């Protein structure tokens, strides 16, 4: 497992600092990136959180998957690293 986790079913009003506080329960958070639509700039309801160690990433998945956050149950799982992917 790598140090990044994928977060889905994220409330659209959620902010990166709020996610950092939530994921800090599992360990040191290195970065948080909420993904936005390229054309509209609106949040897509997904994010990537990088923890400082693989162990903390595993802990975040086990602790926070299906956690209620701002009225929605989060889906938290290991992020799949796609090498060479540059997006659209």
Report the location of each language-model feature.
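Intrinsically disordered, low-complexity RNA-binding regions enriched in Gly/Arg/Ser/Tyr
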Residues: 1-26, 30-44, 50-88
């Amino acid at each position: 497992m790598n140090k990044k986790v994928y977060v889905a079913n994220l409330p659209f009003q959620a902010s990166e600092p709020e996610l950092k506080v939530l994921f800090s329960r599992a360990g040191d958070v290195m970065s948080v990136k909420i993904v936005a639509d390229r054309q509209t700039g609106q949040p897509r309801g997904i994010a990537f959180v990088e923890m400082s160690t693989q162990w903390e990433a595993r802990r975040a998945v086990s602790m926070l998957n299906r956690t209620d956050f701002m009225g929605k149950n989060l889906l938290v799982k290991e992020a799949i690293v796609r090498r060479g992917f540059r997006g659209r």
